[in-house]
Amino acid sequence: MRDGMITEEQCGENFAYILEDKTDFLITEYKMMHGQEADFLLKCVKMLYNGKTELYYDTKSCLPLAIQSGAEDTEGMLSVLGNILHEVRRVTENGFLSLLKLDISADKIWVDPATRKIRFVYLPVAERLHKDVVEFEEHLRGCLLYTSDAADE
């Protein structure tokens, strides 16, 4: 994922990120991910995998945005997109979490199909996934355009 520092591994329907260097893990951000106010994040459990830190993400009852978008009509898709923007704002309001550590690929934004509630993948690591907010916004915009175009087909 990030120049060999983080490796992604599929675990059935779930997935995990394995950190090559355990000092990259940030415990404060990990604890904030489990706060009452962080219900916009996919559930994450820290474990050990062959002596390395593994961040295991539970995707139970959620579908990736890339798949869910195909099942939505126009009104439903607008609702999902609105929920994404709402949850992005909640991340910025949190104060302890950073937008720059959200994995916002279309296959890493998760949607509860029953409620259209959004769950993001957050990596509590030292390195950012995006260099700044402008890059984050461009990546998010591109992901949303790609997803909405795919839903139209």
Residue ranges: model-predicted function:
Residues 1-5:
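Gram-positive cell-envelope targeting signals
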Residues 10, 48, 111-113:
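Generic beta-strand structural signal
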Residues 16-24, 29-78:
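Conserved structural core of kinase catalytic domains
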Residues 76-87:
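Conserved alphaE helix
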Residues 89-98:
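Protein kinase catalytic-loop region centered on the HRD/HxD motif
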Residues 100-144:
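Catalytic activation segment of kinase domains across protein kinase-like and atypical kinase folds
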Residues 146-153:
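Conserved small/polar residues in nucleotide/adenosyl-binding loops
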